């Protein structure tokens, strides 16, 4: 890339399930400013298949090993809910910005620790609440409130 064009964001995905496949990776594939560099899943065959399907150069079974070796700029945490805290904290400790699926954590205390870790690291920690602005959500909100 030229000096005037920034390098693409290097994104790693933790969790190779449906949300990672149909939402995160599908969206990243449409972006010229994003390069998917790694995927991790506790089931290695699922990680490999996901990587092949999306043209991702490496598949991993251990998040910390992946983060150390690949050094992504951003991590999408799409793992099962009970693993969000550990995966988010590992990504922040590795110096990555994080996009985490909902729910952010299993307890308010975990969510607060994640927020503080992001602040201390000077990294963005964002949560994916994309349905908040969907028409059906807005209509339901109006009916309830």
Language-model segments: residues:
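N-terminal Rossmann-like dinucleotide-binding module
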Residues: 1-54
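Glycine-/small-residue-rich active-site loops that bind phosphorylated ligands and cofactors
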Residues: 19-20, 83, 106, 132
